Amino acid sequence: MTILVVTGTGTGVGKTVVCAALASAARQAGIDVAVCKPVQTGTARGDDDLAEVGRLAGVTQLAGLARYPQPMAPAAAAEHAGMALPARDQIVRLIADLDRPGRLTLVEGAGGLLVELAEPGVTLRDVAVDVAAVALVVVTADLGTLNHTKLTLEALAAQQVSCAGLVIGSWPDPPGLVAASNRSALARIATVRAALPAGAASLDAGDFAAMSAAAFDRNWVAGLVG
């Protein structure tokens, strides 16, 4: 059994499509997969990341906890809605209930690693420590990514959360000079597990499955579950 938290260097970097792609690749490798998104914001505009994972990857074991209408950071979205954030033990219990032998459990955060997900001030990093998870970091290939990536990795290391690698959430075609340079530099910081093509979320399920299988190394995916 393996719990992998999927975090990112910020909002809009492609965490959901990466969750879906890794889930699809794992399922094609014969691995049982569950996906958890403890906190979802932006529901008033139709944001539903778990439904997107289900549509793209065919995962049926999907679990969420708190949903807030406005597309804001969870604490701000909760305050705006007159609601509370979940408690730390609620999130931990949600994840623990999914975890089982032979299963890969993916836990998608909201925004970046240190965004508050639970009261008081609990972040995805704290949850990762609680459930003994490793982290996959979704990054961009844009200017600023090297600094943002290093800051995220330093924050993980500060609490002894292992990094399973990086995934570029949206890889342009063709890549420009900056993207190509940053991809090489990112690979010197940590292992780049995949670079998903820009617009991958718009693919149908069949094309998405083929893309996902090609994007990730099958041996690495198979080795995620011991």
From Swiss-Prot:
Its cofactor is Mg(2+). It comes from Mycobacterium bovis (strain BCG / Pasteur 1173P2). Mg(2+) binds at residues 16, 49, 108. This is ATP-dependent dethiobiotin synthetase BioD. Catalyzes a mechanistically unusual reaction, the ATP-dependent insertion of CO2 between the N7 and N8 nitrogen atoms of 7,8-diaminopelargonic acid (DAPA, also called 7,8-diammoniononanoate) to form a ureido ring. Substrate binds at residue 41. The keyword Metal-binding applies. Signal peptide: none annotated. Pathway: Cofactor biosynthesis; biotin biosynthesis; biotin from 7,8-diaminononanoate: step 1/2. It catalyses: (7R,8S)-7,8-diammoniononanoate + CO2 + ATP = (4R,5S)-dethiobiotin + ADP + phosphate + 3 H(+). GO terms for biological process: biotin biosynthetic process. It holds the Pfam family AAA_26. ATP binds at residues 12-17, 49, 108-111, 169-170, 197-199.
